[in-house]
Amino acid sequence: TERANELQVSWTNPVGAISVEISYLLEGDKPENTAKKNIRIATEKVGSLLIVVSEPGTYIVTAVAVDNYGKRSEELTVTATPLREEEVVRTRFLERADILMTSLMNLCFGKSARDCWNTRYPLATGPYWDGDAVVWDQGAGLSGYVALRGASIGVSAYEKKYADLTDRMFNSINRFITTDNKRSAYAVYPQNGNERYYDDNVWIGLDMAELYEQTKENRFLEKAKMVWDYLMVGNTSSCGGGILWREIPAYSNKHTCSTAPAAVLGCKLYQITKEQKYLDKAKEFYAWLIQYMQDPSDRLFYDNITPSMTIGKSKYSYNSGQPMQAACLLYNITGEQQYLNEAQQIARSAYSKWFTLYDSKELGEKFYRINGDHVWFYSVLFRGFLELYKIDGRRDYVTAFEKSMLQAWMSECRNQTTNLLSNNYFIGKTNSSWQVLHEGAFVEMLARLAVLELEGK
């Protein structure tokens, strides 16, 4: 929990069980010192128990369900490390990201033979579909994990837990690789012949680059480069440049959501490898976005353009977040002031458009808050604001996200039974089901805020 020496244990009550036995033991302690709690099951589907331990350390926690005839289920064992006193104040966001990810994995991950994300909770099923999420949602879950893995580094209560999940997460997303047209890329669903989108791939490529930065393991860099090579196939001469949105079935429009993150990935790969080709393409993609996709009246970005140069003028928050991040990275690499100026212009307009003044009873103050329900879009927008904050130190934008997440956690946005968050909360509603796409985005934002908190920023 957010307090020292406490563990919050949650579980799903199995059908037919009348009680759940929870036992816990400090790792390395004698078995006879095991503490046990027996919890009678009422009508709730999910149970929980707050454990207060006497000393810090890693605890082995075991759960066993018991039915009316005294038959015991197989033991389910996990390890957990409570916060130490000195960690409490500085790990508020990390603790919440961990609670959300733990609940999300328990409820939605590994429910099929693919060992991947189900699309939502309650679990999605159907006569012609096993409920496994499409690759966009799989990628959102991965992004949340990667951000949380990074935030946990150096924090004893969490680091090992998320490092130990690395292989499982890596293998899970790679089950979506297909080899259509003699090239490897992530498909909407496993098996050749399924749709493949360039934007689905670039988000995963960015996660792979971030995993490489965390671990320096070449397997992650190889996948980031695989995605880059795939993006280059979609970088045709039509529409003046840019990257196609979809490969299969064939599609002719170029999109901001495929081209802008490609510029970010190009910058990341250049920073990792120092190979000039990545930087050259990043600059090219960014220039194309400015020339063709940016609205000169407010500096925000349109959605797509056709080969006849007709522009689809819808504006989505993430489509401005990625050019902002690309501009920041290009400024860091080149030192050219125009990139920083443009990033700051985008930031001002994005903040004006996608945030609203809100009077929070939970926080007891007014602040600018997220004003839309597509939380995944906002998580990508946040990446741009964070990159800018690292350069100019202006905290207004980051504070808006910080207070939005604090208020969400403390309000009816957080379901008290599942600990999942309602993406509809920011438009005045709550959810009856929770999509991995948005829950992964919530985890990512909490984790990235945790890094700032841990660094005292």
Predicted regions and their residues:
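Conserved aromatic anchor
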Residues: 5-17
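Recognizes extended acidic, P/S/T-rich segments that occur
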Residues: 19-56
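Beta-strand-rich modules
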Residues: 51-74
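Edge beta-strands of extracellular beta-sandwich domains
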Residues: 74-80
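Extracellular interdomain linker/stem segments of modular secreted and single-pass surface proteins
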Residues: 81-86
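CBM-like carbohydrate-recognition segments
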Residues: 88-139, 144, 148-164, 168-199, ...
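Extended ligand-binding groove/face enriched in aromatic
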Residues: 160-272, 276-283
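Active-site cradle of extracellular carbohydrate-active enzymes
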Residues: 259-262, 266-269, 278-330
